[in-house]
């Protein structure tokens, strides 16, 4: 077992290393682009720069199926050069008085607030920080291994175990099912995490499940704060963020809503895209809207964000440009002169080039060839999608209450806020919602290509998270002067939080609050069983084939890809045809005792299975067929003779 003290030291070193490198590169980027160095923005932009740089370095290796070691060696060489250059340049600029560290700015701002005795800001800020820490603690301490981890975490594990950049979904998930790939993968996010694992000597499963949330969750709130600062008066910022994190945590318990993934799997690339990169993207676009001249620096940031979006998930190839288009269309409607509109056309076309190149590369992959077929899939009715997202179909009264609150908030924003804020919060909401009516957009994401409509659900709800905290934040500063309609709105907010935002029923799921059994984020028995088989077969040239029960199978390939499994996730492989029926039927026969012992032996032997792990109520007694090896709790390991 792992020494927890050593593990925590590694985690601490990893956090310091990641945050320091992000800050140094981000501060230099801000200085180079003539942006004022702010600590939070420097961290975010440094992170964006790192993953966009990694995508540029990794993509040629991925397309040629090169070696993982060569890829990370190349990246680390380039990145170390950039990091050292950034650090040296910052020291030189500081010596000349050109650069001022954001830490100095933070100290000055704290002194200013102390002099003003701005109790509201400090109170809401403290509440916000406590809630964020609670969010981080909840994610890092609770145990949940999602089905998607079987692929995403295993991809990083496989790269390290086999020094390979193989991305075939079926093969990575099991090691045996070499079926046509269903994911046109040109995104390097999992390899970026694998690179961090190698550098800081941590297992990829530990990096994904335990370490990444420690800085990705703060990055998420920083990116939203970056947007809020540009939309509202300074005194509302902390109150807004306090309510935002409260609503965000409530959102997390409904699988129908965007923030569910920020609680259950913040390490996934698609969650990084929607909760970190998209808010940053919106903030930069707001800067462009407000800037009358010298906008080149912001367009450069757009290019970095475009590449970073492609790095996190392949759907970034089309979701970021669509989000870009929605923001652009929303702003174009409010533009008062054609001259201002024409100034934007060329920069927009130039900055979208990385996404165009990415889309062309996707179409050249084997899985990408199926996009046209999948896009012909009949999409879901937009009315069904809309009603489902708001929970109106399950809880009509509460769902309608939440929807009314949302629209009333939009009306108040439209009446009381400035042009840019109206454009972003009201216009963006409308145009995002309208995209689901367009079958050209909803078709591909309602199909098998990207896993139902998950990505579109997240996309449509992006503006919602900005609108809902608006009224509560305003009400915090209007105590004693409330109008009747504001009291009603506050009541509706309570109803919405109590009902719609908890509509997924996740509070009844005990797994959500179960503590981690291991630092890998997978069941302890899975680690013990796998270690036993690996130790027993360490001198064998043959890679063992195993069959695990449902409770353990999802953790196996995350922990090691040096074992082959007949089944890792039913969703991927349940319908796979074998000489003995589908894999679903085989598993049912073995684990639900629908086979006799002799039949189970013949099937497993025919599938070349070396070990089968069962629950203790499934017993194989005939030593001619099975040899009992070891028992761990309620799981028993049998060798197939």
Model regions and ranges:
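Active-site lumenal/periplasmic loops and adjacent helix-entry segments of GT-C-fold
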Residues: 131-251, 255-267, 272, 276
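Membrane-interface helix-loop-helix junctions at transmembrane boundaries of multi-pass membrane enzymes
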Residues: 235-239, 295, 336-345, 409-433, ...
């Amino acid at each position: 077992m792992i020494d927890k003290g050593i593990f925590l030291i590694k985690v601490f070193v990893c956090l310091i290393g990641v945050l320091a490198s992000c800050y140094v590169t981000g501060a230099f980027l801000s200085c180079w682009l003539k942006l004022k160095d702010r600590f939070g923005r420097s961290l975010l932009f440094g992170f964006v720069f790192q993953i966009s740089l990694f995508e540029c370095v990794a993509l040629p290796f991925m397309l040629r199926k090169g070696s993982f070691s060569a890829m990370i060696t190349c990246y680390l060489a380039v990145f170390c050069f950039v990091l050292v250059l950034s650090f040296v340049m910052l020291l030189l600029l500081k010596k000349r008085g050109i650069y001022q560290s954001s830490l100095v700015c933070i100290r000055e701002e704290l002194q200013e607030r102390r002099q003003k005795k701005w109790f509201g800001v400090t109170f809401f800020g403290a509440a916000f920080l406590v809630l964020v820490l609670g969010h981080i603690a909840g994610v890092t301490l609770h145990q949940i291994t999602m089905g998607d981890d079987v692929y995403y975490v295993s991809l990083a594990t496989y790269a390290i175990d086999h020094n390979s950049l193989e991305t075939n979904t079926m093969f990575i998930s099991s090691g045996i099912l070499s079926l046509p790939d269903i994911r046109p993968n040109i995104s390097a996010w999992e390899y970026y995490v694998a690179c961090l694992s190698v550098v800081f000597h941590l297992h990829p499963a530990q990096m994904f499940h335990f370490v990444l949330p420690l800085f990705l969750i703060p990055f998420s709130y920083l990116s939203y704060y970056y947007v809020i600062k540009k939309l509202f008066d300074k005194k509302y910022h902390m109150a807004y963020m306090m309510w935002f994190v409260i609503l965000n945590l409530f959102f997390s318990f409904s699988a129908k809503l965007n923030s569910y993934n920020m609680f259950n799997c913040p390490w996934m690339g698609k969650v990084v895209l929607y909760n970190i990169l998209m808010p940053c993207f919106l903030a930069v676009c707001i800067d462009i809207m407000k800037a009358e001249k010298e906008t080149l620096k912001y367009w450069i940031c757009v290019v970095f964000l475009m590449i970073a979006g492609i790095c996190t998930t392949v759907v970034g190839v089309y979701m970021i440009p669509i989000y870009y288009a929605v923001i652009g269309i929303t702003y174009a409607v409010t533009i008062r002169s054609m001259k201002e509109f024409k100034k934007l056309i060329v920069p927009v076309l130039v900055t979208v080039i990385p996404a165009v190149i990415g889309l062309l590369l996707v179409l050249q992959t084997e899985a990408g060839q199926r996009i046209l077929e999948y896009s012909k899939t009949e999409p879901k009715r937009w009315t069904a999608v809309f009603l489902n997202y708001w929970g109106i179909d399950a809880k009509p009264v509460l769902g309608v209450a939440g929807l009314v609150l949302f629209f009333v908030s939009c009306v108040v924003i439209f009446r009381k806020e400035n042009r840019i804020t109206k454009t972003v919060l009201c216009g963006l909401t409308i145009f995002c919602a309208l995209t689901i009516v367009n079958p050209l957009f909803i078709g591909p994401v309602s199909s098998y290509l990207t896993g139902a409509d998950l990505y579109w659900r997240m996309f449509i709800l992006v503006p919602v998270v900005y609108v809902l905290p608006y009224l509560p934040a305003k009400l915090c500063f209007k105590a004693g002067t409330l109008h009747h309609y504001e009291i009603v709105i506050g009541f509706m907010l309570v109803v919405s939080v109590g009902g719609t935002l908890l509509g997924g029923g996740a509070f009844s799921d005990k797994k959500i609050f179960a503590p981690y059994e291991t630092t890998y984020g997978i069941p302890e028995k899975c680690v013990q069983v796998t270690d036993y088989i690996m130790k027993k077969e360490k001198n064998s040239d043959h890679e063992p084939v195993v069959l695990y029960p449902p409770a353990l199978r999802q953790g196996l390939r995350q922990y090691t890809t040096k074992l082959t499994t007949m089944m890792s996730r039913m969703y991927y492989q349940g319908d796979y045809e074998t000489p003995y029926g589908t894999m679903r039927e085989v598993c049912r026969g073995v684990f639900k005792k629908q086979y006799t012992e002799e039949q189970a032996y013949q099937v497993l032997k025919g599938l070349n299975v070396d070990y089968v792990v069962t629950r203790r109520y499934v017993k194989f007694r005939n030593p001619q067929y099975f040899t009992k090896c070891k028992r761990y709790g309620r799981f028993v390991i049998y060798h197939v003779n």
